[in-house]
Amino acid sequence: MKKILLTILIIITILSINVMAVDIDIGEPAINRGSTASTYTWVNIGNPANGSGTITSIEIWASTALTNCEVATFYVVSGNNLSTRDSELIGSVIANSKQTFAVNLDVQAGDYIGAYYTVGALERDSSGFVGCWMNTVDRIPCTNVLFTLRDGEAISLYGIGTTGEEEAINSLFFGTNF
């Protein structure tokens, strides 16, 4: 009888372990780079979102302190015309190190990550990457706005998140979301 109860307890324990969410990542690493990006709206083209769900954390590296920094997920309407899917104000960002912020941004597979700030500069590389889109004014939020393509560039803006698949998997096994 003890063996049966122990076996049942082990099975319940194994089944109640929360299944880890599948990670989403978007953007280029938040690192010290060779140039800077002034107060425009910048969108990384490299490393579009590899899944749909929620971006929960943003990493950013400013070369000079940022003020009124907004981050957003963008999608291509056509050509170099972009729209925002979701955005969030993260506020001030201190300079010269990677800073991490908790966010709650909707994202779809293939989306891009971008930022705008009223003061300061992001770390930027001017060559060796896929590129960035840039617009000279605040385009967070925006709908079907033309951006300028900057080939080879990258800004230090990166996000990670979850697909929300853990809830679906748990509900399959247990009949409810955890």
Q: Where on the chain are the PLM-derived regions?
A:
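Beta-sheet-rich sandwich/jelly-roll-like modules and their strand-loop junctions
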Residues: 20-87, 103-112, 116-167
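Short alpha-helix capping/helix-loop boundary micro-motifs
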Residues: 99-101
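Short proline/glycine- and polar residue-rich coil/turn motifs
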Residues: 90-97
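Viral virion structural and adsorption modules
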Residues: 167-178
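Positively charged n-region of N-terminal signal peptides that target proteins for export
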Residues: 1-4
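Bacterial N-terminal signal peptides
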Residues: 7-16
